[in-house]
């Protein structure tokens, strides 16, 4: 049983092992002896009847299946040992195929190889690192956004703009024919939410309540209804209302008269909001760069993955899909009828999603392998200043990896301009956060001193 045969393909490795008929018979006899002892025949004690009578009550096919199953499990440990010794890049996703031969059985252990990425051309990538410092305008806009969260909307006669909620009736046509699901009354839509197909919401900007007209937009190639993909649709629109958040402006009398509107409180709030924005932009800037880079690279790389691995991921995505349908109390069959799709169409979509998830993940792993930088002591010290300023007592490994990949990539691909901008940004980050922390400390000290001064004044009055 020690003769292994290895067959390699691009995505899988098959380990074949031949087990002779004699070996199978030997194992069969062992199990048969144990099984016969437990069989009862009327007129005899358990296992004491003639062997012919006992065997007549034995399911030999089930017994042989058990023998082969046992041999399969026993041999699997040896297969794993062989794979480790050969340092084969395989995953734990596998199947076992059994083939009966004239003089025995062949066990084929098929393993999914670790997915591979090739033709990774990072130097030609167009994705740029965008670094933005936090301005006073950013701080004020962020404060207003936070203040206006959850505030009610009011009808306006103005032209609709991004962020407004519009109420309208619509009816859609493809090739002059009304299409299913393309009609609604009193439909509510927040402009800029990207709830409709690309190009639809933009054409409602600048329109006032009472406007009637047509909008044309093309369904994307990935649209969930297969029959509508890449087709232009014409929508008849009746715009009934434009609703806008009854926003609270920082320079309004309403805000200035509120407890939050005092100059002292607003000044303190600005400091905390600015620090929050500085920290979030630092983290988001490098994360966005790597995410966009990975997406760009995914369009051109060659990706090799076994269907064995995809099978597990597809099953997982299929379960998520079913859970979502249950959440909305929609039966799968009814959903398929609405989107005019078959079960095969759904499986194709799930497989595409599974491949894409794996692809993005393994492209990032390749970037880690190729570009992850080992920081010098001086660079570690510099980043420690950044983390201290960010109040990160122990930054996550993910963040450290992202920073190491970012710097290594900028250096190895000769992006000197972006590398300088990144290094300057780190200096700005430390200086800005130290300045803000100093302001916060000063405010806190002032707050602790004020009650003490009040107590002194009270004693003097007495």
From Swiss-Prot:
Residues 163-248 form the PPIase FKBP-type domain. This is Trigger factor. It comes from Mycoplasmopsis synoviae (strain 53). It is found in: Cytoplasm. It is an enzyme of class 5 (isomerase). Its EC number is 5.2.1.8. GO terms for molecular function: peptidyl-prolyl cis-trans isomerase activity. Consists of 3 domains; the N-terminus binds the ribosome, the middle domain has PPIase activity, while the C-terminus has intrinsic chaperone activity on its own. Involved in protein export. Acts as a chaperone by maintaining the newly synthesized protein in an open conformation. Functions as a peptidyl-prolyl cis-trans isomerase. Its main location: cytoplasm. Coiled coil: none annotated. Keywords: Cell cycle, Cell division, Chaperone, Cytoplasm, Isomerase, Rotamase. Belongs to the FKBP-type PPIase family. Tig subfamily.
């Amino acid at each position: 049983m020690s003769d292994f045969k290895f067959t390699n393909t691009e995505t899988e490795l098959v380990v074949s092992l031949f087990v002779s008929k004699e070996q199978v018979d030997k194992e069969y006899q062992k199990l048969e002896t144990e099984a016969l002892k437990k069989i009862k025949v009327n007129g005899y004690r358990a296992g004491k009847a003639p062997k012919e009578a006992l065997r007549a009550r034995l399911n030999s096919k089930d017994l042989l299946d058990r023998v082969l199953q046992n041999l399969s499990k026993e041999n699997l440990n040896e297969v794993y040992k062989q794979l480790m010794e050969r340092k084969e890049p395989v995953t734990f996703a596998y199947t076992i195929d059994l083939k009966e031969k004239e003089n025995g059985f062949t066990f084929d252990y098929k393993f999914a190889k670790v997915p591979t990425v090739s033709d990774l051309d990072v130097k030609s990538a167009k994705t740029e690192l965008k670094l933005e410092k936090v301005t006073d305008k950013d701080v004020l806009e962020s404060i207003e956004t936070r203040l206006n969260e959850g505030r009610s909307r009011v009808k306006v006669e103005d032209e609709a703009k991004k962020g407004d909620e519009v109420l309208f009736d619509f009816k859609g046509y493809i090739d002059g024919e009304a299409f299913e699901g393309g009609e609604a009354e009193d439909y509510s839509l927040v402009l800029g939410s990207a709830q409709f197909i690309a190009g639809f919401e933009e054409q409602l900007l600048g329109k006032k309540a009472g406007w009637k007209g047509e909008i044309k937009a093309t369904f994307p190639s990935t649209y969930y209804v297969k029959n509508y993909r890449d087709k232009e649709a014409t929508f008849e629109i009746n715009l009934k209302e434009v609703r806008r958040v009854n926003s609270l402006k920082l320079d309004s009398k309403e805000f200035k008269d509120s407890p939050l509107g005092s100059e002292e409180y607003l000044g303190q709030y600005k400091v905390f909001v600015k620090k929050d924005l500085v920290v979030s932009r630092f983290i988001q800037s490098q994360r966005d760069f790597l995410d966009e880079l990975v997406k760009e690279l995914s369009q051109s790389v060659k990706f090799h993955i076994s269907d064995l691995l995809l099978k597990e991921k597809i099953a997982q995505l299929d379960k998520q899909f079913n859970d979502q349908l249950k959440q909305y109390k929609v039966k799968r069959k009814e959903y398929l009828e609405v989107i005019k799709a078959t079960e095969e169409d759904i499986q194709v979509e799930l497989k595409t999603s599974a491949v894409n998830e794996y692809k993005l993940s393994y492209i990032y792993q390749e970037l880690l392998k190729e570009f992850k930088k080992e920081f010098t002591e001086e660079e570690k010290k510099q980043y420690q200043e950044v983390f201290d300023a960010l109040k990160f007592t122990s930054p996550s490994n993910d963040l450290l990896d992202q920073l190491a990949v970012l710097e290594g990539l900028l250096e190895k691909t000769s992006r000197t301009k972006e590398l300088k901008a990144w290094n300057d940004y780190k200096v700005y980050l430390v200086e800005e956060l130290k300045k803000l922390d100093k302001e916060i400390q000063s405010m806190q000290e002032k707050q602790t001193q004020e009650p003490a001064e009040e107590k002194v004044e009270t004693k003097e009055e007495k």
